[in-house]
Amino acid sequence: MKVVIASDSYKESLKAIEVCEAIERGFGAIFPKAEYVKIPIGDGGEGTVDSLVDATSGRIISFHVTGPLRESVQAFYGMSKDKKTAFIEMAAASGLQHVPAKKRNPLITTTKGTGELILHALDEGAEHIILGLGGSATNDGGAGMLSALGVRFINGKGEVIEPSGGTLHSIVSIDFSQMDSRLKHIKIEAACDVDNPLVGIRGASFVFGRQKGADEEMMKELDENLKHYAHILKQYLFCDVSKIPGAGAAGGMGAAVIAVLKGSLRRGIEIVLDYTNFDKHIEGADLIITGEGRIDEQTAYGKAPVGVAERAKLFHIPVIAIGGSVSPNYSAVHEKGIDAVFSITTSPTTLEEAYKVAEENIEMTAKNIAAVWKIASEKHF
């Protein structure tokens, strides 16, 4: 029996490899002689760099950058063994994990640290950058990142400002003359798991603002600011990013990648599956187990478990998903190829307590799934 375990991380709780190992322990308790293939995955957010570095025999480079609240934070990115491709998660520099829950405020947070990661990768000789969009604490349209790369945002008084979600409305002009010239000669791909536009009811502010600390009034303000930002970008670059699918990813970082860096957006899970030779690994598999921290209606729109299931169905392999939690409206994932969904949460609990017992609950859930699989296999229904 061959079981492929390809799970995403459980955000702010367990890395993808830790989830995969817990599933293997649980399944292994019932099927100790089975062949297990672990493929930690990501869809552009947390854990993506680890997956890509492992797949390319690369290395992790760590150093301090400007955090979302403009304080120094420890961040990292990955570099392939041949030093040609850099793997960057914007969450490593500009993610929610750097901002305590009580301090989350997308009006003041910045993506400047992500730009500093890109600069470092350029200094290391990167010719191709894969930038994972996801898990951000920001809503600045990528302007903070651009400022680190040399772009200057100027207000009505002629002053250069430090852009954030709350200051975009004050921009009256943009100076691109000092933008790092090396950016013109490299390939940039943004790994993106959503197709939300920059603005509007499905835009960055209204869909993702709340998890970053925004209330209703703040979301309206953020959306208006991004509309102004899009208008200014259009004046200079003749590119209207306001309605482009994916431009709203990661607080509008997608817009900056498309309009200014001339990069492309691609489903993050597709990038990861290609780099990990996923199709090769699943040949001959009897079962694939996938998962992520929360399985809900958003999972059906290009997130990691569905990306895994879509590939698996090409080979007619059944797929089971394990989630840290499962929302009542998760059923759309069945239409995308996931055959069964299980939650590791066994009783009402706080988020903090759920984090503490996540690993043992994953193992227990996997063991129970394996036990049912064993019964079904022996009965030959």
UniProtKB/Swiss-Prot annotation:
Statement: the UniProt record of this protein carries the keyword Heme: no
Documented EC number(s): 2.7.1.31
Superkingdom as given in the UniProt entry: Bacteria
Gene Ontology MF terms in the entry: ATP binding; glycerate kinase activity
BP term (GO), one: organic acid phosphorylation
InterPro entries given in the database record: Glyc_kinase_flavodox-like_fold (IPR018193), Glycerate_kinase (IPR004381), Glycerate_kinase_RE-like (IPR018197), Glycerate_kinase_sf (IPR036129)
Pfam family, one: Gly_kinase
Keywords on record: ATP-binding, Kinase, Nucleotide-binding, Transferase
Catalytic activity reported: (R)-glycerate + ATP = (2R)-3-phosphoglycerate + ADP + H(+)
PANTHER family: GLYCERATE KINASE
Similarity comment text for this entry: Belongs to the glycerate kinase type-1 family.
The protein's name in its UniProt record: Glycerate kinase
Species name: Bacillus cereus (strain ATCC 10987 / NRS 248)
